[in-house]
Amino acid sequence: EHEAEIILDERQDNGDGNFNYRFETTNGIAEERVGVPGSQGQSNMKGGYSFNLPDGSRFQLSFAADENGYNADSPFIPTDHPLPAHVIELLALVEELKRQGATWDDKGVRIT
């Protein structure tokens, strides 16, 4: 791959906790961030980045960082698969048995 060159570089920092930042390169890397002062003294930021993958598709991620932590969103972030219906039914059955007083030993064998 050839050397990438910066084709966009915008930065603004007001010195009071408000800022924005954006850049792009010739090989498709891009990033942007906007920041504002948070209610608890932290910097609240929103932004994202993207780049081209070897297969030609584009990776994209957006994020927010604030008093609630860092939260990222991207179709590339793995997600839990939903539980199959039979597992949900079995979990409900176990809860019902517990309500009726059922107990199990440490190996999962029902003792009452």
Swiss-Prot record:
Pfam families: Chitin_bind_4. InterPro entries: CHIT_BIND_RR_consensus, Insect_cuticle. The keyword rRNA-binding does not apply. Residues 16-85 form the Chitin-binding type R&R domain. One of its GO terms (molecular function) is structural constituent of cuticle. Arthrodial membrane. Disulfide bonds: none annotated. This is Cuticle protein AM1239.
